Swiss-Prot record:
Species of the source: Acidianus bottle-shaped virus (isolate Italy/Pozzuoli)
The name this protein goes by in its record: Putative transmembrane protein ORF85
Main subcellular location of this protein, as a coarse class: host cell
Compartments it resides in: Host membrane
Topology of this chain in the membrane: Multi-pass membrane protein
Transmembrane annotation, as ranges: 12-32, 44-64
Keywords per UniProt: Host membrane, Membrane, Transmembrane, Transmembrane helix
Gene Ontology cellular-component annotations: host cell membrane; membrane
Coiled coil region boundaries: none
């Protein structure tokens, strides 16, 4: 399922990447329920990136971080545009 390339890198097949993306989305959904602060899942995702040492957990952590940051930026931009207009 995972081919080890060199010593620190993984080469995931496309189906595994889809499963990891879905896992990231599901994990983000659970982590976003922890706090009303939109940056909490981003911080937890970054922690997972460092705990995973470049493997599957790091990949899921990166997905969570990306979703959390894009959602937080989207909320901030929406709030700013609501105040301006």
């Amino acid at each position: 399922m995972v081919e080890i390339v060199g010593s620190n890198y993984f080469n995931f097949p496309p189906t595994t990447l889809i499963v990891l993306a879905l896992g990231s989305a599901i994990a983000y959904k659970f982590l976003s329920n922890i706090s009303t602060n939109p940056y909490v899942p981003a911080v937890l995702g970054i922690i997972l990136v460092f705990l995973g040492h470049g493997g599957v957990i790091s990949t899921i952590g990166a997905g969570i971080t990306g979703l959390a940051i894009s959602r937080a930026i989207g909320k901030d931009v929406f709030n700013f545009l609501s105040k301006v207009s």
